[in-house]
Amino acid sequence: MAVPKRKTSPSKRGMRRSADGLKAPTYVEDKNSGELRRPHHIDLKTGMYRGRQVLTPKESA
């Protein structure tokens, strides 16, 4: 069974754990509609992605 040769220092332990924290999701303002959307995602209000119409938006009821 593998056993560590040296004790992990608090600094190394902290560096390893630094990637474990949750980050708030990022949003960008859409150029056409002004709505907030996730980057690299389709704008669900307009159905546009990178300047192209990729899906037809649902009609608001």
Curated annotation (Swiss-Prot):
One GO term (biological process): translation
Instruction: Recall the GO molecular function terms of this protein's record.
Output: structural constituent of ribosome
Give the region (Disordered) as residue ranges. 1-33
UniProt xrefs under InterPro entries: Ribosomal_bL32 (IPR002677), Ribosomal_bL32_bact (IPR044957), Ribosomal_zn-bd (IPR011332)
User: Which terms in the GO cellular component ontology are assigned?
Assistant: large ribosomal subunit
Q: Which Pfam families match?
A: Ribosomal_L32p
Any idea which UniProt keywords this protein has?
Ribonucleoprotein, Ribosomal protein
User: Do the record's keywords include Ribosomal protein?
Assistant: yes
UniProt feature, compositional bias: Basic residues: 1-16
Family in the record: Belongs to the bacterial ribosomal protein bL32 family.
What is the name of the protein in this document? Large ribosomal subunit protein bL32
Taxonomy, top ranks, is: Bacteria, Pseudomonadati, Pseudomonadota, Alphaproteobacteria, Hyphomicrobiales
